[in-house]
Amino acid sequence: MPGKFLTYNGSCIYYKTEGEGLPVILIHGFGEDGTVWRYQHTFLKNHFRLIIPDLPGSGKSELLSISPNNTSFVIDLYAACIKQILDQEDVQKCTMLGHSMGGYIALAFAQYNPERLNGLGLVHSSAFADSKDKKTTRRKGITFIQRYGAQEFLKQSIPNLFAEQFTREHPDQIEALIACAGNFSAKALVQYYEAMTERPDRTETLKKIVNPVLFIIGEEDKSVYLQDSLKQCYLPGNTQINILPGVAHMGMWERKDQTNDTVMKFLNYVSDA
């Protein structure tokens, strides 16, 4: 899958492209890079034009230089980075799927560029702002990262993204994701956590989306709880919902075949709309 680079706000940003047809951009989440979509990439590449970025500070992309006073706008900056990638690729409209933090970025993109989307997918993600308890948890995470470093934090937090049964049965998969996270800096993870903590509620954005919206939800997700996910599913006018039983926050790995089938059906639906 060919890799490309562009410069955004003075930082070098990496992304991959492959395939032809409906443009589909896959945005990874916190503590990941574009390779987290490996199973979806393999499944979709012969059917769609895939664009898979490494977000700033992830994978082969450089971190953005952000003032500590501007953390409330960082998710918007990431969304603007995605727009620049689409501009460079001369993609006027696309279907955008975001995992976790990637979903927050996709929603920011939808708020400012609704005319550029023909479909949106939230994969274990939420339009709601962080609750008070969630913000407290993230701030504790920032303290841990600053004290012990990025790798130690991810080594402890990544297993919690998976359902207990999957973790027991597939320790190699957990280790593979931890290995992918080996290049993160503490500064990058802190920037992500601050950005997520300060991001606004985007339920109004979700309500205004006229194109199809897909929700992929983990029944055992401890990061985006099932009951919270269900509250947002009825906000858009054209919704598809897939609840994955026995799955936590990583359906792309925990139930890759079911996730792939769900995404394929959604993208075909968008193509025919």
Predicted features by range, described:
Residues 8-16, 39-45, 51-97, 112, ...:
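Active-site loop/oxyanion-hole signature of alpha/beta-hydrolase fold enzymes
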Residues 22-29:
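Short beta-strand element of the alpha/beta-hydrolase
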Residues 29-39, 50:
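Serine-hydrolase catalytic-loop signature spanning alpha/beta hydrolases and amidase-signature enzymes
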Residues 31, 55-62, 127, 248-251:
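Alpha/beta-hydrolase active-site loop signature
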Residues 88-131:
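Conserved hydrolase catalytic core segment
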Residues 129-136, 148-208:
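Conserved alpha/beta-hydrolase catalytic His-Asp/Glu region
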Residues 208-248, 253, 258:
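Conserved loop-alpha-helix segment in the C-terminal half of the alpha/beta-hydrolase fold
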